[in-house]
């Protein structure tokens, strides 16, 4: 497809809308610039040929008009000279030029339309390229900030997840400690009760040696004698 065949696409292109839809505006802004500069080069190359065609069509159209006027003028002179036969020939020639003039007029209109479209495409591309060049650094800077923020958000989410895990671990530890305390209490309740009387009897149990008993009896006897 020739560049002029892309007139509607180029003229309807909306740079802002294209960038808004792009997943990575930083990369796409460079791609769009390359594409538009390529289109601009094609427009410039083809514009010269289209404008030359416009000038040629316009020149041929005016030349045909001039020839028709000339044939009519010759016919009038022939009639004035009393030569109707020559006048008829000049008028026949004028009639044939009329059909040619219609064709040249149509070709001239097409060439003029093509030239106008090429100029519009040229101006649109120059304008879009200028706008994109002016916004390129800002777009890249904003994209870098957005990606940095995205990484920070992911890091924050990871830290939050870790905190939640630690909190869950703490709750688990409390649950284990509670279960252990309950088990210890139950074990204490299930242990055999202490026999208080047995302990008291053991306190006064004469489990000492017979020598001690003999010495105690001798001491008592001595105390009786001293009285």
Swiss-Prot record:
Entry coiled-coil feature ranges: 33-125
Keyword check for Coiled coil: yes
Induction, as annotated: By cold shock (at protein level). Expression is sigma W-dependent; induced by alkali stress and by infection with phage SPP1.
InterPro entries: PspA_VIPP1
Signal peptide coordinates: none
Source species, domain of life: Bacteria
Keyword field contains ATP-binding: no
Keywords associated with the record: Coiled coil, Stress response
Annotated S-S bridges: none
Region of interest (Disordered), residue spans: 191-211
Family: Belongs to the PspA/Vipp/IM30 family.
The protein, known as: Phage shock protein A homolog
Organism listed in the record: Bacillus subtilis (strain 168)
